């Protein structure tokens, strides 16, 4: 394998072991020319997949592009990288073992949304807003409704108001825990 640092034609494998989920082989390499060290991953590719885009164009499936799109949705979220790798590997395996040599970009997008929904709700909403091309706030509200949580500021229905406990004078006078609120001038 060519060295990514100096372009040297030969590198030596110093360590080789399976990845955490055993879906790849992790190899630690060193370049004898420049001494640069780097890691490579070797994965099984069941079949060559072709992605049929919305425009009708056909492009080869790119696992790295799938990884990047998930990483963008997860930016600044605290999700274990191993869980992300398992998600990407799982989606790739599902697509490759699907029996078809051609897969639509919609099928890939739906698989990513399904995976992100179980991984991180914020990343799910971020990805969905781009994938489904949200244009207005109502699109977000509709999607958030599918997550099952009440939206902030959403009005209660009359029958729900009765179920909400009313604060007593003691509870209202009790000191609040946590950080004090900061008043703005």
From Swiss-Prot:
Region: Disordered, residue numbers:
1-24, 161-185
Q: Name one GO molecular function term.
A: zinc ion binding
Compositional bias (Low complexity): 164-175
Q: Which GO terms describe its biological process?
A: negative regulation of DNA-templated transcription
Q: How is the cofactor bound, in the record's words?
A: Binds 1 zinc ion.
Cofactor(s) recorded for this entry are: Zn(2+)
Q: Where is the composition biased (Basic and acidic residues)?
A: 12-24
UniProt cross-references to InterPro entries, sorted A to Z: ATP-cone_dom (IPR005144), NrdR-like_N (IPR055173), RNR_NrdR-like (IPR003796)
Q: What spans are recorded as compositionally biased (Basic residues)?
A: 176-185
Zinc finger, unnamed: residue spans? 3-34
Domain ATP-cone intervals: 49-139
Q: Which UniProt keywords apply?
A: ATP-binding, DNA-binding, Metal-binding, Nucleotide-binding, Repressor, Transcription, Transcription regulation, Zinc, Zinc-finger
Role of this protein = Negatively regulates transcription of bacterial ribonucleotide reductase nrd genes and operons by binding to NrdR-boxes.
Which family does this protein fall into?
Answer: Belongs to the NrdR family.
Q: Which HAMAP family match?
A: NrdR
What is this protein called in UniProt?
A: Transcriptional repressor NrdR
| Originating organism | Methylorubrum populi (strain ATCC BAA-705 / NCIMB 13946 / BJ001)
Please name the taxonomic classification of the source.
Answer: Bacteria, Pseudomonadati, Pseudomonadota, Alphaproteobacteria, Hyphomicrobiales
């Amino acid at each position: 394998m060519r060295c990514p640092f100096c372009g040297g034609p030969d590198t030596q494998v110093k360590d080789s072991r399976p990845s955490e989920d055993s879906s790849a082989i992790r190899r630690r390499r060193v370049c004898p020319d420049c001494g640069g060290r780097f890691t490579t991953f070797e994965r099984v590719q069941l079949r060559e997949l072709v992605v049929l885009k919305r425009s009708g164009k056909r492009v080869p499936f790119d696992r790295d592009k799938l990884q990047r799109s998930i990483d963008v949705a997860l930016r600044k979220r605290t999700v274990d990288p191993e869980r992300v790798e398992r998600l990407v590997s799982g989606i790739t395996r599902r697509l490759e073992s699907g029996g078809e040599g051609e897969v639509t970009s919609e099928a890939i997008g739906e698989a990513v949304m399904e995976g992100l929904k179980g991984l991180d709700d914020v990343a799910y909403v971020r990805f969905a807003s781009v994938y489904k091309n949200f244009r207005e706030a109502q699109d977000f509200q509709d999607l958030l409704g599918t997550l099952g949580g009440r939206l902030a500021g959403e009005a209660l229905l009359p029958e729900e108001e009765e179920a909400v406990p009313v604060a007593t004078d003691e509870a209202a006078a009790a000191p609040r825990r946590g950080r004090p609120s900061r008043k703005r001038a």
